[in-house]
């Protein structure tokens, strides 16, 4: 997907994964496609709050890095990425192991309300800031509850009259009413 977009002139992409060790796999896979492996660059190479100075490439980071908030004069990692990509970005954002963003919308637990996860909220902030981005959710782990799918707003399941459900709350209600078969 990234290579297809690259060949169409969209020369910036973001790859978010659970572990920084997976960058070696990402570089190997990118190289196997005939591309320069060093074009896959870790966000950790750039200090938080400083500009990302890549003209093009695949920015690799972890969910733990993505959730880094503003710190004094240093902007959040989400803002740093958006500044690099530009608000009109229409390239690819890969959420590898996307289930790591589960509980992005919070919900109800056995002991009451459950706060939204920081990783999930950061993933949603990135998606909201880049409405034209081509978002890919990759996960072999199924959601255990419908609330855990709040991060996956780009699936087109809720969001207005052009979607099956007007809101995420309507989607959650319908799936919960349908039971296990609906999941």
Feature names for model-found ranges:
Residues 12, 37, 133-134, 156:
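Secondary-structure boundary/capping positions in well-ordered alpha/beta enzyme cores
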Residues 178-183:
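Conserved AAA+ ATPase small/helical "lid" subdomain
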Residues 1-122, 162-176:
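SF2 helicase/translocase NTPase motor core
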Residues 152-158, 174:
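Conserved AAA+ ATPase "sensor/coupling" helix adjacent to the nucleotide-binding pocket
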Residues 22, 144, 158:
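Flexible, glycine-rich phosphate/dinucleotide-binding loops
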Residues 27, 150-153:
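Short, amphipathic alpha-helical segments that act as regulatory/interfacial helices
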Residues 99, 126-150, 163-164:
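Conserved helicase ATPase motor motifs in RecA-like P-loop NTPase domains
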């Amino acid at each position: 997907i990234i290579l297809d977009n690259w060949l169409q002139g969209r020369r910036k992409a973001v790859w978010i994964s659970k572990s920084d060790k997976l960058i070696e796999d990402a570089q190997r896979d990118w190289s196997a496609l005939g591309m320069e492996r060093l074009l896959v660059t870790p966000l950790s190479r750039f200090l938080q709050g400083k500009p990302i100075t890549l003209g093009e490439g695949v920015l690799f980071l972890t969910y733990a890095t993505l959730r880094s908030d503003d710190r004094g004069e240093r902007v959040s990692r989400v803002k740093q990425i958006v500044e690099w990509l530009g608000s009109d970005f229409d390239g690819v954002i890969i959420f590898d192991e996307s289930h790591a963003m589960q509980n992005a919308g919070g919900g109800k637990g056995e002991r009451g309300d459950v706060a939204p996860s920081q990783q999930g909220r950061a993933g949603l902030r990135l998606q909201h800031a880049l409405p034209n981005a081509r978002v890919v959710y990759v996960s072999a782990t199924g959601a255990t509850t419908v609330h855990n799918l709040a991060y996956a707003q780009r699936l087109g399941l809720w969001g207005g009259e052009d979607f099956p459900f007007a809101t995420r709350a309507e989607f959650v209600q319908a799936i919960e009413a349908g039971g296990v078969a609906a999941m």
